[in-house]
Amino acid sequence: MKQILFMDTTLRDGEQSPGVNLNEQEKLQIARQLERLGINVMEAGFAAASEGDFQSVKRIANTIQNATVMSLARAKESDIRRAYEAVKGAVSPRLHVFLATSDIHMKYKLCMSKEDVLDSIHRSVTLGKSLFPTVQFSAEDATRTSRAFLAEAVEVAIRAGANVINIPDTVGYTNPEEYYSLFKYLQESVPSYEKAIFSCHCHDDLGMAVANSLAAVEGGALQVEGTINGIGERAGNAALEEVAVALHIRKDFYEAESSMTLKEIKATSTLVSRLTGMVVPKNKAIVGANAFAHESGIHQDGVLKEVTTYEIIEPSLIGESQNLFVLGKHSGRHAFTEKMKELGYEFTKEERDVVFEAFKNLADRKKEITEEDLRALMLGEAAFAAQQYSITQLQVHFVSNSTQCATVVLKDEEGNMYEDAATGSGSIEAIYNAIQRILGLECDLADYRIQSITQGQDALAHVHVELKEGTHQVSGFGVAQDVLEASARAYVHAAGKLKSFITLVK
């Protein structure tokens, strides 16, 4: 049984999804959950892209203990050295250097000859190997590259010291049979093939990213790259949770396994969805809301008689809870702390006191507190704690068929209070206008979405907003039992990010 490594690029490729804008604290939250999931390698970002990216990569590298942390870099000395400075503090640092090898990229993007590309690969990998214990080389647009030249480029990279060779389907162009044969071709055509681990990286432009990844495993790939929920540029990447469960359920066919902690899949998917604002489709495989639902009477009858008639995956395998009541208003601090530890959360005493107070406030208003509620509570409190501004008071004057008025009081990190009021055609517009007046912002609301965390009239609300000012767009979220409060929290979260960006560029 061969062991498959999983390389997660949610924090780099996934964050390139249109409208996704994660701050440092949010990236760290995801990185910690990826560690709990058992991801072998996480691409923390592109350190040379900006100072913000550099700091995020560095913080993740200095925090994660049980996974390799990697930074992307172009085949440029400045990028490689910047990546080294960012991840050198990691327990297991890695460089990911890439260069395009297809004719179309070499001609129109790079303006380089094949000889120039081979020389650049050699120089960049050699430099990387002098700094990093492991180096991964990616031949960008590999599936549209001449196979003979691809084999030549891969051989140069391995001889220069590359430990991992990635064969990406950058534009989602290939199909399973073709991708399988490409890995087999490289196995036969690259003299130093056995000296490196071969990896696959598939995009979903033609809807075959997961199928192509599994075909690569059949063809000899020992590392699979992708993102949680399959997020990413254009149509996204291979969904790692789908690949992992497919390998587990069909061990008989693939004869492969991974070290992924499958019961953490649902929690990871939910966290990524809520922080990025990218909703998981209900019919998505593995983690969609309908993944274990049966509407057909024939199917329901079969499942009631014998669950395996129509269910090949047990919900508990991926950590899908039945949303049972776990805590209530009579639960004490110790029970709360132990339950949160069970869910993977650790606190300082000060953090525990703040979160426990938020829990008790929720328990006073909500009869039953589920695991989903606790995760949402943690997510909301973590976001709130990292904000420049917090809401201390929110008052809305509602009159049917009339202009609405809202009064908002915000507190900044130094404890200064700011109050203003505004009107709007609806309660939410009035709240948002008041917040804009306080923060001195002029921006457009590009998106507003609301989602119920659990069922019932007393369920928590999760609101996602996207704000746009010029060409810059940011997202924010808020969690509360009251929809207006959740909406206000989401707006303050996003507005704080936007205000920081505007201050930075000025």
Swiss-Prot record:
Its EC number is 2.3.3.13. One of its GO terms (biological process) is L-leucine biosynthetic process. It is found in: Cytoplasm. PROSITE patterns: AIPM_HOMOCIT_SYNTH_1, AIPM_HOMOCIT_SYNTH_2, PYR_CT. CDD domains: DRE_TIM_IPMS (cd07940). It is an enzyme of class 2 (transferase). One of its GO terms (molecular function) is manganese ion binding. Disulfide bonds: none annotated. Mn(2+) binds at residues 13, 201, 203, 237. Residues 4-266 form the Pyruvate carboxyltransferase domain. Belongs to the alpha-IPM synthase/homocitrate synthase family. LeuA type 1 subfamily. Catalyzes the condensation of the acetyl group of acetyl-CoA with 3-methyl-2-oxobutanoate (2-ketoisovalerate) to form 3-carboxy-3-hydroxy-4-methylpentanoate (2-isopropylmalate). This is 2-isopropylmalate synthase. It comes from Bacillus mycoides (strain KBAB4). The gene is leuA.
